[in-house]
Every structure is written in structure tokens, then in C-alpha cells.
Amino acid sequence: MCGAIVLLLLVGTSPAPVEGLRCRTGEGPSADDVKRIVRTCMNKITNAGTMGEWGQRDRNGEEQQMMRDYGRSHRRRKRQYYGGQTSGSSSSGSAGEHSYNGRASPQYGEAGQGGNGTRSGGNSSSSSSSTIERDRACLMQCFFEEMKATNADGFPEKHKVLHVITKDIREHELREFYVDSIQECFHMLGLDNRLKDKCDYSMRFVTCLSDRFETNCDDWESVTSAMF
């Protein structure tokens, strides 16, 4: 599998493709390589003391559980990040895509944690969910680091990501699709000057790529089913 397929498998999407390309390739890291990188990243986050509930799980199956759990919340995150506005002004272009119920989307780890911790019922559950969301976002950022595709500050870097993801793609049309998708997603994220966190940025980038794959890859469902 090529780099983009690996990243999107970690997101755990369940797409409903409309038409288009055969995006699955036989190149790139194997499933064992993916699991090794995921374990490495989970260990890093655990050792940093930020794994929250993930640190309590059975290590034998946690990487697959992470992928499956992540798919359940993917649709909700897409509504929040890429079309969650419900009121207020929404200018054309990307502004509406980056709104969160009419406000700036929160950084991972901030949602549901109000300034003094006095949010109404469900605050504890919301805080726990937010911690797990944060951990998963940082797992994705670590994945970019392990693929040598980040800049000095740990953010995914466009030219490095382009190289890592497209270097093994030989089919011209498919390669163009990957290049266009990566460039478009970096462009969209560049329009949001609120993105100052490398974990949040990494997950937003992968979510953007996932949207492109859902729309354009008519074999994406077979890719996810093959993984699980």
C-alpha cells in the first residue's frame, strides 16, 4: 500500500464513493510495517504521559481497536471540521469548511473543557473523549514523523509528504490525483491561521485527504475491508 492508503486506513473511513479511480496499490509499507509504526507512536505517547485511557488498554490489540473506534467518530469530525456551521456568517470558499457551529474549531484537547470546568452535565465524559481525540491526532502526527515527512517543528511538510506518498505510484492519472489532492489539502489548511498545533494540523490534513478519496476512489471500500 502507498503512503496515502496507509494514512487513510488509520482514519478508518467507511466511504460511499461516487465514481473514479482505482486508488489501491501494491506498493509501499506492508500491514506489518503499519502496525510497527503505530506501536512505536503509541509507545512514544505513552512514555510522554499523554495517552489517557489508551494507556490502560490491552497492548495486544489496541492498534486495531484505535482504527475501528476512530472510524465511528469520523463522520462527526467531518461535520465539525468541514461543514459544521449552523448559524452566523459563512463566507464562500473554505471559511465554512473550517467553522465549528459558527465558531472557530477547537484545538484537540480543548473541546468540552471550559475555562473553569463548570460545563453542564457530561463534562467528565466529554473531557475523556477529548483526551482520546487528542491522543489519536498525535498518533497521526507521529506517523508523519516516522515517515520522515515533517518539518523541523513536527508539522507535515508539503514537499516531503508529496515525495513519501507518490514516489511508488507509476500510473500517471492516479499519481496526478494524489498530487492534486495533497496540494489542495495543504492549500485549504494554509487558509486557516488558527491551526497552530501539529497534532491538530496532521489530523485535519488526513481528514481532508480522506474526503478526496471517498469522492474519487471507487475501490476505497475494498481497501478498508482488506485491512480489517
From Swiss-Prot:
Query: Does the keyword Disulfide bond feature in the UniProt annotation?
Result: yes
Q: Which cysteines are joined by disulfide bonds?
A: 138-199, 185-208
- Write out the entry's keywords from A to Z: Disulfide bond, Olfaction, Secreted, Sensory transduction, Signal, Transport
Query: What ranges does the record list as Low complexity composition bias?
Result: 83-99, 121-131
Q: Name one GO cellular component term.
A: extracellular region
One of the protein's GO biological processes:
sensory perception of smell
InterPro entries per UniProt: Odorant-binding_protein, PBP/GOBP, PBP_GOBP_sf
Q: Where is this region: Disordered?
A: 50-131
Any GO molecular function:
odorant binding
Pfam families with a match to the protein in the record: PBP_GOBP (PF01395)
Can you say where in the cell this protein is located?
Secreted
Where composition is biased (Basic and acidic residues), the residues are 55-72
* Regions of compositional bias (Gly residues) in chain numbering: 111-120
Per the UniProt entry, the signal peptide is: 1-20
Function, as annotated, reads:
Present in the aqueous fluid surrounding olfactory sensory dendrites and are thought to aid in the capture and transport of hydrophobic odorants into and through this fluid.
What is stated as this protein's family in its record? Belongs to the PBP/GOBP family.
What protein am I looking at? General odorant-binding protein 71
Name its species.
Anopheles gambiae (African malaria mosquito)
At the highest ranks, the source species' classification is: Eukaryota, Metazoa, Ecdysozoa, Arthropoda, Hexapoda
Query: What is the name of the gene encoding this protein?
Result: Obp71
